[in-house]
């Protein structure tokens, strides 16, 4: 399928000295980017950050923003977990959003889904034992975190988590439905 290269070093961050707000006593705003503004993009959401600050919000928790099939969705059926959804503004849009949040004193947490893949467009099983039938979730076979071949599967998800923190300056991750891991 289609793919592209992205140079993370080309983006010029302004938040080099950012300090994440403490999570103790935090006031989170869970944001579905596609419905937060009429534009449904990172850039449109930047225009409303002052409003969140005025509400007393300390951390913005983004619902999943990875690529998913179709034009509308909650993001919980992601299939390209390393790709920021282009409809929202792609990698640069997310970086501008995080940079702007930090400029407003807002931390950014990202909701990640590591317990299942979306039902359409998931090709990970063609490349390795990403799923196991030993345990099923409400969405189908569970992700293989414990069976044969699971070392590389775990590395895939660890690399993904590190990418969000390192390359997108996330202040934390919220793991969806951890009770479904095993």
Q: What is the predicted role of each segment?
A:
Residues 1-6:
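Extended acidic/polar, glycine-enriched regions
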Residues 11, 16-23, 28, 32-182:
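Substrate-binding/active-site clefts of carbohydrate-active enzymes
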